[in-house]
A protein has these predicted regions:
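Hydrophobic alpha-helical segments
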Residues: 1-148
Length: 148
């Protein structure tokens, strides 16, 4: 057992990844597991994090695809107030879920940003890699679900 990875982190990352990947059945499973282990506010916080990070991920991928530097610097101009209080989560948990969601959504800008923040706050490279592994496994399971 990895002491850095408690149930809240593992199930939260798995739930966030399933929501971001769109796998309906696996999302139901992880939501049920989260509700058994944690309170409703945790589930709502994960959902809020997925919503805001999906908005950010689409915007930053869109902006980074622009043909010139001026357009790549365009301001977002969308309210993301929920990030001020980390969607009701601990800062590190919020950043961890945000990294997981950004990996699922393929946003390089956000992956780099959240990784840097986690490293600056003492998280190890292995911690970062394991977040990517959780996201990868859940996305793979979601893809299999869509085949059936």
């Amino acid at each position: 057992k990895n002491s850095e990875f408690d149930d809240k982190l593992v199930y939260g990352c798995a739930y966030a990844s399933s929501l971001a990947s769109g796998g309906k059945n696996i999302t139901k499973v992880f939501e049920s597991e989260c509700l058994k282990r944690f309170d409703d506010s945790f589930v709502e916080s994960v959902k809020s994090t997925v919503a805001i990070m999906s908005l950010n991920n689409v915007w930053y991928k869109f902006r980074d695809a622009m043909p010139n530097n001026e357009m790549k610097m365009a301001p977002q101009r969308m309210r993301v107030n929920i990030m001020r209080d980390y969607a009701g989560l601990d800062k590190i948990l919020f950043e961890t879920f945000s990294l997981c969601i950004s990996a699922v959504n393929g946003c390089n800008f956000c992956i780099k940003s959240h990784t840097e923040l986690l490293l600056e706050n003492g998280k190890s490279k292995d911690y970062i890699y394991n977040i990517g592994r959780i996201a990868s496994i859940v996305v793979a399971a979601s893809k299999i679900e869509s085949i059936d």
